[in-house]
Design a protein with these regions (language model features):
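ATP-dependent helicase/translocase motor core
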Residues: 109-112, 121-216
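Conserved helicase motor core of SF1/SF2 NTP-dependent helicases
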Residues: 185, 192, 196-205, 215-220, ...
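Short glycine-/polar-rich loops that comprise or flank the Walker A/P-loop
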Residues: 89-95, 112, 250-252, 332-334, ...
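GIY-YIG nuclease catalytic motif and its immediate N-terminal context
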Residues: 1-69, 73
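Inter-Walker segment of RecA-like/P-loop motor cores
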Residues: 253-303
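Conserved short loop/helix modules at catalytic or binding sites
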Residues: 36, 67-113
Length: 383
């Protein structure tokens, strides 16, 4: 077997200002290395703007068929203090230009998505100024993507280990594991679309206390499904707003409830890094503070509950009610719960069979998502 060697990617670092860009452009145009010149001028390019803010970094990742024109467009927005481009006036700002002779539109979008996903998981990066990602249907071998990406990352790491830590360190991080930016399996994607459809329907009919139950064993990808669907609602809202579309059936009035302090930290970091906190304030809560803060008279639109088997069914600590799920349902139009039946063990979370059965009997079984390992036996059911 002949093993095809994937060519080395081009990774060029340029100071992020118009003069440095002009010099770089001149170098490219005058270069005797035809392949280098051709790759940067005639193939799509992935690029990263990064700058320091206090002790941390912020980044913007993009891809373009014309890197020089695209960068000038970004620079034209620098005077506006409300735009991320305003930060590029900082002398610490850098631009990385990334090219490869095999880049096509679909691959550069995948590389861009993976860079956004990785950089969002890096501890020293406090903000990734990108909108939603759009996973591609692949028109090339996935192994080639992994190979080219690893080479790009290695070169970026050579330049700055704080911004570009080891790939393995990223994949082990709690933020990466809970990130809404994972590429979903077909089953997860179906489940996500179905949940969103039900949310839109409930908002359209101005319903209250709608319950969507997502069941599955531990390790079936419910966490990623949960965070991805939660984030998607914000993305849809932003897109409709930016396109001046009717916002009646879109919502940014969404909350994520989690039970552990570590999870609160992780999801708050995700909300900060993706700019949700800046735009919408606190979107992540523990159940009791959420119940105490929001009133029955003014319900929020959507609440997602991760690990709903941990909700209390009796008063304990600062919780004075009898059933947290009941109390959440009274305060929201739609509640999406991720439920792990095998894990209902301790007494204060003791979901008596009757309570559980009562919920389920009010619910028509809607759909089983996939029989395979990823989301084996996730049932989506609604009241």
């Amino acid at each position: 077997n002949v093993i095809m060697r994937v060519a080395e990617p081009i990774v060029e670092k340029v100071q992020d200002n118009i003069n440095a860009l002009k010099i770089f452009e001149k170098q490219i145009l005058e270069s005797n290395n035809e392949k280098f010149k051709d790759t940067i001028l005639n193939f799509p390019i992935v690029y990263i703007h990064n700058w320091k803010s206090k002790n941390d970094y912020e980044v913007y990742v993009g891809e373009s068929n014309n890197i020089f024109q695209r960068t000038r467009q970004h620079y034209s927005k620098m005077p506006d203090e409300n735009e991320w481009q305003h930060n590029l006036s900082d002398e610490n700002a850098n631009l990385y230009v990334i090219g490869h002779e095999h880049f096509n539109k679909s691959m550069t979008l995948d590389i861009e998505n993976r860079l956004i996903h990785y950089l969002m998981s890096v501890e020293n990066i406090k903000k990734v100024h990108n909108g939603r990602n759009n996973p591609q249907n692949r028109y090339y071998p996935i192994e080639e993507l992994d190979d080219i990406f690893a080479k790009i990352w290695k070169k970026l790491r050579k330049d700055n280990k704080e911004v570009f830590p080891l790939e393995t360190a990223i994949k082990d991080s709690a933020i990466f594991k809970a990130s809404p930016l994972h590429k979903l399996t077909e089953e997860q994607q179906k489940a996500k679309e179905m949940i969103i459809e039900k949310v839109v329907k409930a908002l359209r009919n101005d319903e209250r206390g709608q319950l969507i139950f997502v069941e599955g064993e531990a390790g079936t990808g419910k966490t990623v499904l949960n965070s991805s669907t939660f984030y998607e609602l914000f993305c849809r809202y932003e897109e409709a707003k930016n396109n001046n579309e009717d916002l009646k059936y879109e919502t940014s009035n969404c909350f994520l409830l989690v039970n552990h302090d570590e999870q609160i930290t992780v999801y708050n970091q995700i909300a900060d890094k993706l700019g949700l906190t800046d735009k919408y304030g606190q979107v992540v809560y523990k159940p009791t503070p959420f119940i105490n803060k929001y009133s029955v008279d003014n319900p929020v639109d959507v609440v997602f509950v991760d690990e709903a088997h941990l909700l209390l069914t009796q008063g304990k600590q600062s919780y004075r009610g009898n059933n947290q799920l009941e109390d959440i349902l009274k305060r929201a139009k739609v509640v999406v719960v991720m439920f792990d039946e095998d894990q209902i063990l301790t007494t204060e979370q003791y979901w008596e069979d009757e309570i559980l059965e009562e919920y389920k009997s009010n619910i028509k079984r809607d759909m089983v998502v996939g029989e395979d390992k990823i989301i084996s036996g996730v049932n989506i059911v609604e009241e």
